[in-house]
């Protein structure tokens, strides 16, 4: 699957804006560009888990099976799932529909910032010290650290990580991961995506998160790509407001994950057990992990 990337003409791009990513659409675009069809489903390891590229899977059962192969302590994500009900039907007890929205920014809609960021600089990750700084940020935000030995190599379409550091102290204050879809799975539409944006909760510099998003957008624009996608929790209104300001719009596609202790709050949601004391919560959480239904009769009394 090699060849020159053919980006859509403006009139074709308008049509693409209302079309969801699917396996059939990807194969049609590859055929249209006289490129080889995808030979097998593709996934990219990001150091904390795999991104399973949903539109490279011709079969829902195979996607469900691959999600069930998630390694202990990792977090796999199946993105661009067109028919999530078909995938969930193969493992309803182990998989769940992620309550996040996918947003897309077409680069033709992007407007650069009027002023450059001040007080920090953004650069690529190079050293072991850089990775340690990134993992410190992720752990501070309750996110999984990056296992560098697990990363898909860059020459095989692996991700790229960026670091924002304080201009005065050199201390890392933010990080973000980007994926070039043209390199990752020969995406004929010239897409890219943003993952794992994190800013130090103690950072006093304003605008670090927005600057990292803009940096990634402008980086992929310089690579002649067409759009950037990202995923945001459906009720994160503050983040959504920022993304809308930058030109992102909702995309009709879905994400599926495997149930684990890391994402438990996403598939359980708040319930009456929220008012239980810490010791009762331990028992309830363990019951949920084992798939046991819990009924709270008296939260104050721990019953």
What are these regions (language model features)?
Residues 95-114, 233-237, 252-275:
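C-terminal "cap" of GNAT-fold acetyltransferases
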Residues 274-303:
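Conserved N-proximal alpha/beta basic substrate-recognition cap immediately N-terminal to
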Residues 64-66, 83-98, 210, 222, ...:
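Conserved active-site alpha-helix within GNAT-family acetyltransferase domains
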């Amino acid at each position: 699957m090699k060849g020159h990337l053919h980006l859509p003409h403006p009139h074709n791009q308008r049509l693409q804006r209302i079309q969801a990513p699917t396996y059939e659409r990807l194969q049609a675009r590859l055929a249209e560009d006289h490129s080889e069809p995808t030979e097998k489903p593709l996934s990219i390891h990001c150091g904390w888990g795999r991104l399973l590229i949903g539109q490279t899977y011709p079969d829902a059962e195979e996607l469900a099976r691959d999600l069930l192969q998630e390694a202990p302590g990792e977090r796999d994500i199946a993105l661009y799932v067109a028919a999530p009900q078909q995938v969930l039907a193969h493992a309803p007890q182990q998989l769940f529909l992620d309550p996040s929205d996918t947003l897309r920014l077409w680069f033709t809609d992007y407007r650069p910032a009027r002023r450059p960021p001040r007080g920090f600089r953004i650069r690529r990750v190079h050293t072991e010290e850089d990775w340690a700084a990134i993992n410190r940020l992720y752990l501070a935000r309750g996110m999984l650290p990056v296992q560098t030995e697990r990363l898909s190599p860059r020459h095989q379409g692996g991700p790229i990580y960026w670091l924002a550091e304080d201009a005065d102290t050199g201390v890392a204050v933010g990080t973000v991961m980007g994926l070039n879809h043209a390199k990752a799975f020969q995406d004929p539409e010239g897409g890219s995506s943003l993952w794992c944006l994190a800013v130090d909760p103690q950072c006093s510099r304003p605008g670090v998160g927005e600057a990292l998003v803009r940096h990634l957008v402008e980086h992929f624009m310089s690579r002649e790509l067409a759009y950037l996608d990202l995923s945001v929790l459906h009720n994160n209104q503050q983040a959504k407001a920022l993304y809308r300001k930058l030109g992102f719009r909702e995309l009709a596609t879905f994400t599926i994950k495997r149930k684990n202790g890391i994402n438990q709050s996403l598939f359980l949601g708040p319930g009456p057990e929220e008012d239980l004391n810490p010791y009762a919560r331990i028992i309830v959480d363990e019951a949920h992990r084992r798939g046991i239904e819990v009924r709270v009769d008296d939260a104050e009394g721990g019953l």
